[in-house]
Amino acid sequence: MKKGRLYLEMRDYIEANYSDATLNVNALSEHFERPAPFVSRYFKEMNGTNLTQYIHKVRLEHVKEKLLQDEKLETIAVTCGFGSLRSFLRIFKQYEGVTPTQYRELHGKKEETTNENI
């Protein structure tokens, strides 16, 4: 398997499985039958981004689409692969600079009910 091909397969696998909360370097290591340190180092060499950061970015792209719909934050967090609402809120703010509710307000939708101060 060529290196470029393995990278593309990893990207495709992440995109297809972003909603799985257990998706991480160990899951990719197991799926592609490669040691976790290799998977982590190889992905960063090919993409320029840490694997965990890349998974977060893929998930957040899906989150941003869902925020423009009427889904509750708790539902979005679970369906986009975050293990908890708390981690979802922390990661979203870390990457986007605003809370999910603020993002929604800036982009035209308002959250019905949620507590972001968890």
Residues covered by each model-derived region:
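Basic, amphipathic alpha-helical hairpins
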Residues: K2, E9-L23, F43, N47, ...
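Basic/polar phosphate-binding segments, predominantly the helix-turn-helix DNA-binding elements
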Residues: N26-Y54, A77-Q102
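…primarily DNA-binding HTH/wHTH and HhH modules…
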Residues: K2, R90-I118
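A generic alpha-helix signature
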Residues: M1-R5, E9, R34, V58
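Terminal helix-turn-helix DNA-binding modules in bacterial transcription factors
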Residues: D12, E45-G83, L106-I118
